Amino acid sequence: MSKREDGRLDHELRPVIITRGFTENPAGSVLIEFGHTKVLCTASVTEGVPRWRKATGLGWLTAEYAMLPSATHSRSDRESVRGRLSGRTQEISRLISRSLRACIDLAALGENTIAIDCDVLQADGGTRTAAITGAYVALADAVTYLSAAGKLSDPRPLSCAIAAVSVGVVDGRIRVDLPYEEDSRAEVDMNVVATDTGTLVEIQGTGEGATFARSTLDKLLDMALGACDTLFAAQRDALALPYPGVLPQGPPPPKAFGT
């Protein structure tokens, strides 16, 4: 089988590097690298929930996605300068939010909010899938932080891991984890978000340059899910290390009666 321009086989991911504790202030901070794509993912904990969520006893999770002006080869203006978010930015922010809410019991948070921020430092295709994969690790660290602070009603509110990967048809071949060079000329382009329990969270797929058969869809999903298994292993390896920051001291346990 012939190799791709970057030397990979069709089913191979780019090198994946997950660095926890990349910045100090958030409860969770992760730099994730999919090859040349680099995304900083942070998870911040704040007391309270949106107004429409108050008095429910439920927590909330929201996410924002953005790209640095120089993340691509040509600098672009910050969207804050333009005065409005692009449709793409809003779409990806909502995708990250939906993906992570699929794995957490919001009731366990109490009326607290976890805010996920994903900032693309360097873009070479697959920024949204890298953001989701890295944001899960940041979320897991934020949950550890909340648990140490005694703010969780359930010490294990995460029901599964979440990862995402791009897959597509390029030059008539099914390939996974497309860099920009492949993504820009793909006949079929798809993003798959999955759990480590074998279920799917979201599938975004389009025939960019051609229609595709049901059998091709099945092959795309098979390759994407196989790649997600590799990403889950990378997440587990990263999270096997100790929490990278200083954990808060929770409230003391209640005294036993008569002591």
From Swiss-Prot:
Species this protein is from: Mycobacterium bovis (strain ATCC BAA-935 / AF2122/97)
PROSITE patterns: RIBONUCLEASE_PH
Protein name: Ribonuclease PH
EC number of the protein: 2.7.7.56
Sequence positions that bind phosphate: 88, 126-128
Biological process annotations from GO: rRNA catabolic process; rRNA processing; tRNA processing
Assembly description: Homohexameric ring arranged as a trimer of dimers.
Chain's gene name: rph
Gene Ontology molecular function: any one: 3'-5'-RNA exonuclease activity
